[in-house]
Amino acid sequence: LKYKMVLIFLIVIMLTPMTVSAHEHTPIEKLDNISDEALQMIKFQRYDDGKKLLSYFSEQFTDISNKEHPFTRDELRIITVSHDEAMEAAASPSMEYEERVQRLTKFRLVVDAIATSHQPLWTEMKNQILTAFQDAKEAASTGDTAHFHSNFNNFMALYNVIYPSMKIDVSAENIQRIDARINFIDEYRSEVVNNVKSQQELEGLEMDLKNLFENMDEDEADPSLWWVIISTGSIIILTLSYVGWRKYQGEKDMRKNRSRVHKD
């Protein structure tokens, strides 16, 4: 019984950190939650509440930056710019609803990209972005100028929403390659629609976009899961060791009893 109690105690001790970590939020996770709440307020057209949350975010962000310095220079710049745009959206008396939501979404995705080590939220826009682009590509192949312009504008609007977040998670080299293709297509729209050879840029951009999202999908598992894996493995090993020890102890006791019987 004594050994069984020791085993139970060890298992509880090993599981406790997992339970605590599941309920405690890091300062950056708190910022992530605030950004999400601000987005929800703007979606519900509660602009004053959204503005208050953005002000609160700014206070917390400054406090964390001064105390812990968890952000790189690029991250600080990207967060600051996207926060300023979000605050302008919340405070504006005349900005269109869609523009407000777009700016808050951009801000929300930036904070998530910094707070999340794998599969950031911006990758969830994969289907929307690829669909808009493929519609533009199809319009170009049929020579439909009006629909090409419309769909390519939709694609660029969606791409601009995730662009700051991409700069946090994606290498500068990959972003520059995609930017170069987009800028060429945007500048020479008429040529892309009317010239089959120029449409090869559309093929190249489509491939780059697919690779971008596929590489993010293949991201490694959350490092925090390693604690669960290691702890679970340790518990299994500990349990098997205890069972083995009990079996050995039982066999040892049986040998002692047999020895006593023979002596008697």
Map each language-model feature to its residues.
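Long amphipathic alpha-helical segments with strong coiled-coil/leucine-zipper propensity
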Residues: 67-126
